[in-house]
A protein has these predicted regions:
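Interface amphipathic segments
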Residues: 1-167
Length: 167
């Protein structure tokens, strides 16, 4: 087991603290990663990486989240990057079983501005789900603007005779 130290790490000039001693990662000999990391900073930025220890069916079951990352801080330190502001948050879940893989991710930016021009609230997400016996996979995506869904795309990937085909 790997315990992350110190108790209040400084990352990118920001002081974090672990919530309720949630500061460990464990790599089992079967290559499954177990984790319980919950870090918050003084300005609300958070990072979480957690696995379900009670899940005995999946080979891997992991959630990762980054919340309230201030884009303005990034554009101030990267040369030639356009001036962006807003709060970026993202969450992803990865579940792997012996026969299938499921992935979902969502990201949003609240109050996005680009070169001091208001853009709005932007959100997007995607989900990849297994189908019948690994021969079919489903994809669902969306894009939102100011909390209204403005675009969706769904797809089905099928395999027949070793060749993949999108519907």
């Amino acid at each position: 087991m790997l315990n992350l130290t110190p108790a209040e790490p400084v990352i990118a000039y920001r002081k974090f603290h672990f919530v309720d001693n949630s500061n460990w990662i464990y790599l089992h000999n079967n290559m499954r990663v177990y984790a319980n990391i919950d870090m918050d900073s003084d300005n609300g930025l958070g990072f979480r990486m957690q696995s379900d220890k009670n899940d005995s069916i999946s080979l891997q079951n992991m959630n990762v989240e980054l919340s309230r990352f201030q884009l303005g801080e990034l554009s101030e330190v990267l040369p030639y990057m356009p001036r962006l502001t807003g709060l970026f948050s993202a969450e992803a879940q990865y579940i792997q079983t012996p026969t299938s893989l499921q992935v979902s991710a969502e990201a949003n930016i609240d109050e996005l501005t680009y070169e001091r021009q208001h853009v709005g609230d932007i959100g997007m997400g995607a989900t990849w789900l297994p189908g019948d016996k690994g021969a079919t996979h489903y994809l669902n995506t969306y894009f939102s603007y100011d909390n209204r869904e403005v675009m969706t795309a769904d797809g089905i990937l099928t395999q027949k005779n070793g060749k993949a085909r999108w519907k």
